UniProtKB/Swiss-Prot annotation:
Main location: nucleus
Organism classification: Eukaryota, Metazoa, Chordata, Craniata, Vertebrata
UniProt keyword list: DNA-binding, Isopeptide bond, Metal-binding, Nucleus, Repeat, Transcription, Transcription regulation, Ubl conjugation, Zinc, Zinc-finger
Tissue: Expressed mainly in hematopoietic cells and testis.
Segments forming C2H2-type zinc fingers: 238-260, 349-371
Classification via SUPFAM superfamilies: beta-beta-alpha zinc fingers, POZ domain
Name this protein carries in UniProt: Zinc finger and BTB domain-containing protein 25
UniProt key word Zinc: yes
Gene Ontology process terms (BP): negative regulation of transcription by RNA polymerase II; regulation of cytokine production; regulation of immune system process
Role, per record: May be involved in transcriptional regulation.
Amino acid sequence: MDTASHSLVLLQQLNMQREFGFLCDCTVAIGDVYFKAHRAVLAAFSNYFKMIFIHQTSECIKIQPTDIQPDIFSYLLHIMYTGKGPKQIVDHSRLEEGIRFLHADYLSHIATEMNQVFSPETVQSSNLYGIQISTTQKTVVKQGLEVKEAPSSNSGNRAAVQGDHPQLQLSLAIGLDDGTADQQRACPATQALEEHQKPPVSIKQERCDPESVISQSHPSPSSEVTGPTFTENSVKIHLCHYCGERFDSRSNLRQHLHTHVSGSLPFGVPASILESNDLGEVHPLNENSEALECRRLSSFIVKENEQQPDHTNRGTTEPLQISQVSLISKDTEPVELNCNFSFSRKRKMSCTICGHKFPRKSQLLEHMYTHKGKSYRYNRCQRFGNALAQRFQPYCDSWSDVSLKSSRLSQEHLDLPCALESELTQENVDTILVE
C-alpha cells in the first residue's frame, strides 16, 4: 500500500468517525449548531483552536455566529478531514473572514480554489456536519445523544429518520463525492426550510463544563433548605405579659401596651415598661419561689380570716373589680408588673382549699375571701403583689387585735384603705386610676 492510499484510508475513517460523533473529543458550538470533531485535527489546521486547547481543558468550544457562520465552519471542517471542498459554493468574503478568524492559513488557497471551480448555478446548501437543535416543543435535548443512522451514502434513510424525530435534526454533509446533484437538491433544501420555520432552543451540554451544568440544572439542596429556615428564624413572637396576646413585631406590642396604660384594656401597665429594651421577651421564672409565694399568700389570708371578726357594717361600699384598677408608677414597679414577668398559663396559681387555678395573685387573693363569705377589702391594692401584701400584715394584725378589745377602735379601722393609700402616695406611687 502506497502512502497516498494509506493517508486516504486514514482520512476516510476519521471523517466517518466525525459524522457519527465516534471517538470525538471536542465539540464546537456555533449558535444552536454543534459540531463533533477531534482536537488533533482542529489543532493541526487552526492556530485558533491550538491556542485554546493549550490554555483550556473544556471539551466544548463556544463560538459566536458573528465571528464565523455555521455553514462556513462546516465548509472548512470538511476540507480539514478530506482535503477537498464540498460541491457547493459559499460567499467568498465570508469564507475569507472565517479563515482569518480560525487562523487557518493553510486552508486559504484550497478553499479559494475549490470555491472558484464550481459555477454560480451550483446549489448553495448548508452542508452542516453537526447536530442542530430546532424544535417547537420546550424540550431539552442533551448534546451527548448518539444518533445511529445509516452510512453517509444512504441519504434517503437519513431524511426518513429526521422526519420521524423532528426534535433532533442531524444535518450531515451532502456535498461528498459519492453524492449526486439530485440528492444535494433534495435534503439540504428541506433542511433549510425546516430551520427557518422552527425556532432554535438552547440545549444542555453534557460533556462540556459538567460542574456548571450540574449547578444550573440541579440547584444545591442547601439553598432550598436554608430558605424556609431563614424565614422561620426571622419571625419572632412578642408576648404581652399582662393579657397573653402575641405580636409579630415590637412596634405592635408597644402600641398594645399603650392601650393598657390608657386604661382601655383591663390590666394596667407601668409607663416605664414602654421604654424597656427587653420588651416582650419571656424570661423563665423559678417555679419553686412561685410556689412558695402562693403558699405564703394562702397562709396569710387564712390566718387573717381566722383572727378577723365579721364586720357586716363595712359592706356598704361595693368592692372594685380587677378590671377597674390600673396602676402607673415611675420609680419602683411592683413585682407582678415587672416587664420580665411572663404571663403564661403554665404558671397558674392554685387555691389550697378548692384547687381552682388563677393566672394572677390578685384573683387568687380575692378568691380566698369568697371561701369565708367576705368581701375583698384590699381590692384597691390587688395589683401590688406579694411585696405590698407583706405590708398589710401589721395593719391586719393590729386591726384584728383592737377590734376584739373595743368596737370603737374597730370603727376607726374602717378608714384603713385610705391610710394605705396615703402611705403609698408617700412612696412615689403617683396615681391610682379608677375607670
